[in-house]
């Protein structure tokens, strides 16, 4: 099988986005350009969501309460990704609201220490995601909650791709600047994959309204966040990409809950 196939791009995307053990041969001869491989970010997200959904479903089957099932799934996602996106969300919150100048905000975002804004933001997002998953379990069942995790993890990385493409780099020499930006064709491919996952994971539980809700919420929130990034630091960084993924994930789950 060709290393530059969509499967190869998915495995290399998983290598960047997660800590899952992966066959080394896929990283030897293929195109290791992250902006090109990024077309498979939604597929990598779907794999992570599938594994987290399996944790949620199995926890429910051994009679754990919905909140415990949701928290275990969230913990599984964080463990698989090394809390990559949560770290970006926390750093973004500390930087944006802990300083008054763009340069100082960027300096704070590079600091590995967690501040008050980061801690509060992570508590809110983890709590909100757990509450949404718990509600889906209560209203539609654990199977649909597991499916929703697949959809939200895939689609949120489609949103992250669009966010990455649309905004200029705010930190010369930073991660997102050093690897470049995805081309429009990559974004379109990633969006199509993410949309397909939304159709097949949300509509069975919440109908077309859940799909519309998810798209409207995610688009609106990411657009607002993009404007905030421009105002605060003049563009995007690796941290804000992680924050965009977290925002998109919560938006998709909220869209489904609103339709149930």
From Swiss-Prot:
Which InterPro entries does this entry report, sorted A to Z? Answer: CobS
Q: How does it sit in the membrane?
A: Multi-pass membrane protein
The EC number(s) this enzyme carries: 2.7.8.26
**Which GO CC annotations does the UniProt entry carry?**
plasma membrane
Name a GO molecular-function annotation. Answer: cobalamin 5'-phosphate synthase activity
Where does it reside? Answer: Cell inner membrane
The processes (GO biological process) annotated in the record are: cobalamin biosynthetic process
Q: What class of enzyme is it?
A: transferase
The metabolic or biological pathway listed in the UniProt record of this protein is:
Cofactor biosynthesis; adenosylcobalamin biosynthesis; adenosylcobalamin from cob(II)yrinate a,c-diamide: step 7/7
On the tree of life, the source organism's domain of life is Bacteria
Which key words tag this protein in UniProt? Cell inner membrane, Cell membrane, Cobalamin biosynthesis, Magnesium, Membrane, Transferase, Transmembrane, Transmembrane helix
TM spans (from-to):
40-60, 64-84, 117-137, 192-212, 214-234, 240-260
Listed cofactors: Mg(2+)
Catalysed reaction equations from the record = alpha-ribazole + adenosylcob(III)inamide-GDP = adenosylcob(III)alamin + GMP + H(+); alpha-ribazole 5'-phosphate + adenosylcob(III)inamide-GDP = adenosylcob(III)alamin 5'-phosphate + GMP + H(+)
User: Main role?
Assistant: Joins adenosylcobinamide-GDP and alpha-ribazole to generate adenosylcobalamin (Ado-cobalamin). Also synthesizes adenosylcobalamin 5'-phosphate from adenosylcobinamide-GDP and alpha-ribazole 5'-phosphate.
NCBIfam families, per the entry: cobS, PRK00235.1-2
Q: Which family does it belong to?
A: Belongs to the CobS family.
Protein name, please?
Answer: Adenosylcobinamide-GDP ribazoletransferase
The source organism is Brucella anthropi (strain ATCC 49188 / DSM 6882 / CCUG 24695 / JCM 21032 / LMG 3331 / NBRC 15819 / NCTC 12168 / Alc 37)
């Amino acid at each position: 099988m060709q290393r530059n196939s969509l499967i190869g791009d998915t495995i290399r995307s998983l290598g960047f986005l997660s800590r899952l053990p992966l066959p080394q041969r896929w990283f030897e001869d293929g195109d290791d350009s992250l902006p090109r491989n990024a077309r498979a970010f939604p597929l990598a997200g779907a794999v992570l969501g599938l594994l987290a959904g399996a944790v949620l479903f199995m926890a429910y089957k051994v009679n754990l309460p919905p909140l415990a099932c949701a928290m275990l799934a969230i913990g599984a996602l964080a463990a698989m990704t090394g809390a990559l996106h949560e770290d970006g969300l926390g750093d973004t919150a500390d930087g944006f609201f802990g300083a008054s100048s763009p340069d100082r905000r960027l300096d704070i975002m590079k600091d590995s220490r967690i501040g008050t804004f980061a801690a509060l933001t992570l508590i809110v997002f983890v709590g909100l995601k757990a509450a949404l998953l718990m509600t889906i379990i209560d209203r539609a069942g654990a199977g649909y909650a597991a499916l929703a995790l697949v959809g939200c993890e895939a689609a949120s990385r489609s949103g992250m791709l669009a966010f990455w493409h649309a905004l200029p780099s705010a930190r010369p020499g930073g991660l997102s600047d050093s690897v470049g930006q995805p081309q429009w064709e990559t974004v379109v491919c990633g969006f199509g994959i993410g949309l397909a996952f939304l159709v097949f994971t949300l509509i069975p539980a919440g109908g077309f309204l859940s799909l519309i809700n998810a798209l409207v919420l995610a688009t609106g929130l990411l657009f607002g966040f993009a404007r905030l990034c421009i105002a605060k630091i003049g563009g995007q960084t690796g941290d804000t990409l992680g924050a965009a993924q977290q925002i998109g994930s919560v938006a998709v789950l909220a869209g489904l809950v609103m339709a149930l």
